[in-house]
A protein has these predicted regions:
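N-terminal, charged/glycine-rich beta-strand/loop interface patches
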Residues: 1-118, 123
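Short acidic-hydrophobic catalytic motif
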Residues: 118-121, 126-128, 141, 145-200
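Outer-membrane beta-barrel channels and translocator barrels
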Residues: 77, 136-138
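Glycine-rich, often acidic-flanked micro-motifs
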Residues: 205
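Intrinsic-disorder/low-complexity, polar/charged segments enriched in Ser/Thr/Lys/Arg/Asp/Glu/Gln
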Residues: 67-69, 128, 202
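Conserved small/polar residues in nucleotide/adenosyl-binding loops
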Residues: 210-213
Length: 213
């Protein structure tokens, strides 16, 4: 796939190609993972052959210096759901950050639901996430990107240093949507009207069907 080049070499990686077989069942024609990212085998709850795949982090969370890449390609006729079994935790960081790149490509006739759980940045963490989603006309993409205030139950609320997430969606190679989120709690009250309006979770759901974002 012709995704943009990464600025750094990842130390954790997932790569999947979803393909539909002759019986109409979607399977992982390619599956690769490198710890600290790990893939579980596909599950099937629906009679239509939709593959449900979970990614997990054996370390329990994401650390400073982590550079994590997820690449998913959904071929024509394939129908897949990609998610995580729990929140994506970003642990406290002393002198560096974590960077995450998510790359999705949906071919015409493919259906991909990319629905990871919430990102939870712990106190003093710095997170940079870059989402690049490419969809051909006739492909279907549902993608979620959500972040919470932190470990609220432990008394942390917006105690992270910086959370930044950039999302670009391309349809047939043309940029259709650019969404940039940059949250720095120390510089402004994120709960004020016009920002989070009192809510402690911020998220976006991107739906691309028949080239309508």
């Amino acid at each position: 796939m012709l995704w943009d080049a990464l600025t750094e070499k990842p130390n954790g990686e997932i790569s999947i190609v979803f393909r539909r077989n002759a019986e109409g069942k979607t399977y992982m024609a390619r599956q690769y993972h490198k710890i600290p990212l790990q893939l579980l085998k596909a599950h099937y709850y629906d009679v239509d052959g939709t593959a449900i795949v979970y990614s997990l982090n054996p370390a329990g969370g994401i650390l400073q210096h982590d550079r994590l890449l997820t690449e998913i390609e959904c071929e024509a006729g394939a129908d897949a759901i990609f998610t995580t079994p729990g929140n994506n935790k970003y642990y406290r960081m002393d002198d560096d950050c974590a960077k995450v790149w998510n790359r999705l490509y949906v071919h015409s006739g493919g259906i991909l639901e990319y629905l990871p759980e919430h990102n939870v940045p712990f106190a003093d963490s710095t997170v940079y996430q870059d989402n690049e989603f490419r969809v051909e006309k006739g492909g279907v993409l549902f993608a979620a990107d959500m972040v919470t205030a932190g470990r609220v139950a432990s008394g942390e609320r917006f105690d992270y240093t910086h959370y930044a997430s950039r999302t670009r969606i391309f349809i047939d190679g043309e940029l259709a949507l650019y969404d940039n989120c940059s949250l720095k709690p120390s510089e402004e009250d994120l709960l004020q009207t016009g920002l989070l309006d009192g809510y402690q979770t911020n998220g976006s759901l991107y739906v691309d069907r028949k080239s309508v974002v």
